């Protein structure tokens, strides 16, 4: 017999087949002992690595919206939840921004620390209601970068790599 084990690590699905399963006691608790798997699958359906936005310095995106029947434009600030080379996810602000799938927002300004503004258009690809720990409900919008120049894409990739290197260095010192 074999047991299929599935888990997630950093939002990446990990799966393996466990053979030779034995029920044992470990530190006074029931547990399973298995042979090391021959193969471990890491399943990530992404073209780009996704970085959860650092809590040390929050990322924001300024989204221009037209109000007063197209006579005036204001920028609505949205908190960035995660970012990749292909797009980002934001918490939709409770006021000032109406969002629906396939909506496009031109001339958005992604504010990266130490880098400045990345100007791009965003297309909303998906929307999810998220229930927070305190019971409040927010809307999460997954957005794709459109009309992103090569230089701006490279800047985003450098930022992601820098933050990931810093996180890995902190993990190693623990």
Please provide the spans of the model-predicted regions.
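Structured alpha-helical
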Residues: 1-174
């Amino acid at each position: 017999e074999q047991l299929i084990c599935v888990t997630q690590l950093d939002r990446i699905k990990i799966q393996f087949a466990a053979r030779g399963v034995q029920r044992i006691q470990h530190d006074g608790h029931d547990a399973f002992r298995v042979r090391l798997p021959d193969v471990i699958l890491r399943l990530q359906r992404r073209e780009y690595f996704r970085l959860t936005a650092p809590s040390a310095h929050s990322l924001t995106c300024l989204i221009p919206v037209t109000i007063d029947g197209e006579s005036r434009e204001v920028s609505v600030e949205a908190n960035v939840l995660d970012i990749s080379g292909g797009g980002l996810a934001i918490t939709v602000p409770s006021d000032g921004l109406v969002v629906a799938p396939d909506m496009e927002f031109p001339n958005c300004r992604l504010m990266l620390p130490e880098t400045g503004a990345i100007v791009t258009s965003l297309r909303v690809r998906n929307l999810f209601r998220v229930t927070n720990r305190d019971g409040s409900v927010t809307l999460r919008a997954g957005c794709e970068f459109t009309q992103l120049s090569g230089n701006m894409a490279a800047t985003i990739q450098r930022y992601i790599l820098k933050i990931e290197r810093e996180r890995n260095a902190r993990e190693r010192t623990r």
